[in-house]
Amino acid sequence: MTRKLVLLRHGQSQWNLDNRFTGWVDVDLTEQGRREAAAAGRLMREEGLQFDVAHTSVLKRAIHTLQGALAELEQDWLPANKSWRLNERHYGGLQGLDKAETAAKHGEEQVKVWRRSYDIPPPPMELEDPGHPIHDRRYAGLDRNALPGTESLATTLDRVLPYWHDAIAPQLKDGKTVLVTAHGNSLRALYKYLNNVSREEILELNIPTGIPLLFELNDDLTVQSFRYLGDPEAARKAAEAVANQGKAK
């Protein structure tokens, strides 16, 4: 039996539009982002997908994308499992900074390392910073030592994988069709795990906003196939635009 999993990056957020490092800052969708969420839902409907379960982060750009997509699928009733483990990678002291200005200051290669390397985190956010997650009530029930002040993709993967093993994988093994609506780097982490992508290859992977990525999996959850829904060229261009965000103007 083929298991179906869709990974969906949230639609364009205000800070995507502004080209700023977002991380765990709770920025909402733009109108374009809301249109992308609806378009993602239409693509999934045209594919004939109906979901048994949905997962998302605790950040509203992902939650609102999920809601917009489910509305197009006429599955507004589907409950969403929300977990901080699906949050975007924490960008530490870079959060809120303009990516192009940061590239002009530190060099494009350094910014590419911070954005796309596997195990090198950005400079950390200080505990005293009011933006640190230890001061956010949505994380109040968690061990403060588990809450990051910065993350690499490697530590993001370490955060995401327990949720995959405990929540998502058992549902797929039970034959459920699963939708995960999350963020560029939490989804890159899952993509790396599912496809056994090398540390070097993951550097070049960019996930576009609002385009569903369909995985077909075997019983043991090894990958049969994966593809973006809709126009492949549109997905390629959207991923290329993500790659260009870290370049100086």
UniProtKB/Swiss-Prot annotation:
SMART domains: PGAM (SM00855). Pathway: Carbohydrate degradation; glycolysis; pyruvate from D-glyceraldehyde 3-phosphate: step 3/5. GO terms for biological process: gluconeogenesis; glycolytic process. It catalyses: (2R)-2-phosphoglycerate = (2R)-3-phosphoglycerate. The keyword Isomerase applies. The keyword Kinase does not apply. Substrate binds at residues 9-16, 22-23, 61, 88-91, 99, 115-116, 184-185. PROSITE patterns: PG_MUTASE. It is an enzyme of class 5 (isomerase). Catalyzes the interconversion of 2-phosphoglycerate and 3-phosphoglycerate. Belongs to the phosphoglycerate mutase family. BPG-dependent PGAM subfamily. Homodimer. This is 2,3-bisphosphoglycerate-dependent phosphoglycerate mutase. It comes from Stenotrophomonas maltophilia (strain K279a).
